[in-house]
């Protein structure tokens, strides 16, 4: 029993980027006949593409209401909010953003938002680790400082005070002595050498 020959259209299915000619064929056909069933549309339009390829090309790029340009900050906030609520339900999210396709939103999320969030998590982790290291070093420095204060050499203030004293000055039986750092008040209450010799002369007379 002989096998039936394969459909030539199945063999010649085109893959890869769409050409401008293919885009114009698809646009004109849908403008005249509507979307319909995509597998039948591809054959009827004479395109050597699968029905899925025609559908994605039309919905994501060729529709008149497809919004051009970069996603705005407002749209980005809405995408982040809805993704936190619905997860990866890109078609549902796309319905809240007129002119944006589910494929466009999915690509934007993965290449821009998700990547930025992952980098932010890594940066936060690095900052935390650095801060912890600085805190540990600070604690170690404080501990070392406290240990040095507790175990370091103790200054003998008594020895310093004793070494700063001048020898007592004796004159005969007089035991008056001058402090090493006299104040104005101590000078007023202490006899000078001139006063002392004056008293000696008076006693001699």
Curated annotation (Swiss-Prot):
Domain of life, per lineage: Eukaryota
Presence of keyword Nucleus: yes
Xref: Pfam families: Myb_DNA-binding
Main location: nucleus
GO MF annotation, one: DNA-binding transcription factor activity
Domain named HTH myb-type: residues: 10-62, 63-117
SMART domains, A to Z: SANT
Subcellular location, record wording: Nucleus
Keyword Cell inner membrane (UniProt): no
GO cellular component, one term: nucleus
Residues in the DNA-binding region annotation: 38-62, 90-113
Keyword tags: DNA-binding, Nucleus, Repeat, Transcription, Transcription regulation
Tissue: Expressed only in flowers.
Coiled-coil regions listed in the entry: none
Function: Transcription factor.
Protein name: Myb-related protein 305
Organism of provenance: Antirrhinum majus
Organism lineage: Eukaryota, Viridiplantae, Streptophyta, Embryophyta, Tracheophyta
